[in-house]
């Protein structure tokens, strides 16, 4: 795959969607045509599964079944959108990917790491991110942001969970970033949007320069 695959990870209210939009604008200013996508979702099949997951209907079947649903959505997303875009040399910006499954289903769902690694390997079939930006913010602050962003809309099932669960996920993301420093860049998300965006642009521009694309 000849393109560049960048994923954004972090807890609720970390600002992933905002930073994806800002980075996409920056890339367009440099002549790129980035693909913006999300998980769960990003392809027709994956979006159908997204509705089942976020509605809470999947909770009935337990975390193992839910992890398989995420994996099925991811496999379709990779095959239908991500892999073809990368083959065309596009830059793909994805809101959540494998690390969210590791944190949400693996850690707080108490699923075995071997089980999670097996379904991850099948779902992505080699489509690992070139760069993962882990936006870090304490759980309480992130949930406050998410509530303000949501306004009068109903919180999804993940936002409704206890603060301790959200903090456990935060620690899971931090551990992933610590274990995979070559892929993951930890970003302090408890700052202004502009400062966060500046750091992200710097990281991405460095990679593009190294690849001779900028």
UniProtKB/Swiss-Prot annotation:
InterPro entries: P-loop_NTPase (IPR027417), Thymidylate_kin-like_dom (IPR039430), Thymidylate_kin_CS (IPR018095), Thymidylate_kinase (IPR018094). Its EC number is 2.7.4.9. Signal peptide: none annotated. Pfam families: Thymidylate_kin. ATP binds at residues 10-17. GO terms for biological process: dTDP biosynthetic process; dTTP biosynthetic process; dUDP biosynthetic process. GO terms for cellular component: cytosol. Gene3D superfamilies: P-loop containing nucleotide triphosphate hydrolases. The keyword Cytoplasm does not apply. The keyword Transferase applies. Keywords: ATP-binding, Kinase, Nucleotide biosynthesis, Nucleotide-binding, Transferase. It catalyses: dTMP + ATP = dTDP + ADP. GO terms for molecular function: ATP binding; dTMP kinase activity. Phosphorylation of dTMP to form dTDP in both de novo and salvage pathways of dTTP synthesis. Belongs to the thymidylate kinase family. This is Thymidylate kinase. It comes from Brucella suis (strain ATCC 23445 / NCTC 10510). The gene is tmk.
């Amino acid at each position: 795959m000849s393109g560049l695959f960048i994923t954004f990870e972090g807890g609720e209210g970390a600002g992933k969607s905002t930073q994806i939009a800002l980075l996409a604008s920056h890339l367009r200013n440099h002549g790129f045509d980035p693909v913006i996508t999300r998980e769960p979702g990003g392809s027709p099949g994956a979006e159908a599964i997204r509705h089942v997951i976020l509605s809470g209907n999947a909770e009935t079947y337990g975390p193992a079944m839910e992890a398989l649903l995420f994996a099925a959505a991811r496999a379709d997303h990779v095959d239908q959108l991500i892999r073809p875009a990368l083959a065309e040399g596009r830059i793909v910006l994805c809101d959540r990917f494998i690390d969210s499954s590791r944190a949400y289903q693996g850690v707080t769902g108490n699923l075995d790491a071997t089980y999670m690694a097996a379904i991850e390997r099948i779902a992505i079939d080699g489509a690992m991110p070139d760069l993962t930006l882990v936006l870090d913010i304490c759980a309480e602050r992130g949930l406050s942001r998410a509530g303000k962003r949501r306004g009068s809309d109903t919180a999804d099932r993940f936002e409704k969970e206890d603060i301790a669960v959200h903090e456990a996920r935060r620690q899971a993301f931090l551990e992933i970033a610590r274990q995979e420093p070559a892929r993951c860049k930890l970003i302090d998300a408890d700052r202004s949007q502009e400062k966060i965006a500046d750091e992200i642009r710097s990281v991405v521009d460095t990679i593009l320069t190294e690849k001779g694309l900028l």
